[in-house]
């Protein structure tokens, strides 16, 4: 009888631990999905302010303008893939890493060309989102 009680207690503790782990996983997934949605919204805002800054600045019509537009397009595509994976509840650290790498290209451009104003502020928000994304996926990341 004592063995049965110990076995029951052990199974109960295992079940509780498993349920707790599952709940934590669901919280993490929900948080990561929210980060991705915020990232998309902030990226759209950044893209509009970047277009505005480029059209009214010395980079208008240059190869550099084409370059940053291509970086942003690739970044948005990678973010869309990550969002699709997150909506399917699939953990995708490699896609998160791709989004971060694409973001790094934009960051390098923004620093090199010193685009400030709304574009700079909006990019700073996107960078914060990316830092949260890296933490959510446990990706070691530095700018």
Can you say where each PLM-predicted feature lies in the sequence?
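A charged, solvent-exposed segment within the mature domains of Sec-exported extracytoplasmic proteins
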Residues: 111-143
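Positively charged n-region of N-terminal signal peptides that target proteins for export
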Residues: 1-4
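Bacterial N-terminal signal peptides
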Residues: 6-15
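N-terminal signal peptide c-region/cleavage motif recognized by signal peptidases
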Residues: 17-19
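Generic structural concept
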Residues: 33-36, 40-43, 65, 69-76, ...
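Long, amphipathic, charge-rich alpha-helical segments that form helical bundles/coiled-coils
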Residues: 68-114
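Immediate post-signal-peptide N-terminus of mature secreted/exported proteins
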Residues: 21-69
């Amino acid at each position: 009888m004592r063995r049965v009680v110990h076995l029951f207690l052990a199974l109960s503790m295992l079940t509780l631990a498993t349920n707790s782990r599952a709940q934590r996983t669901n919280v993490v997934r929900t948080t990561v999905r929210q980060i991705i949605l915020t990232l998309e919204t902030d990226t759209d805002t950044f893209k509009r302010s970047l277009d505005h800054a480029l059209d009214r600045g010395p980079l208008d019509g240059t190869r550099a303008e084409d370059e940053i537009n291509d970086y942003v397009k690739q970044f948005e595509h990678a973010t869309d893939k990550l969002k699709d994976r997150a909506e399917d509840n699939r953990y995708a650290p490699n896609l998160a890493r791709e989004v971060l790498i694409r973001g790094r290209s934009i960051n390098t451009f923004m620093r090199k060309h010193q685009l400030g104003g709304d574009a700079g502020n909006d990019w700073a928000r996107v960078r914060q989102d990316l830092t949260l994304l890296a933490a959510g996926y446990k990706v070691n990341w530095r700018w």
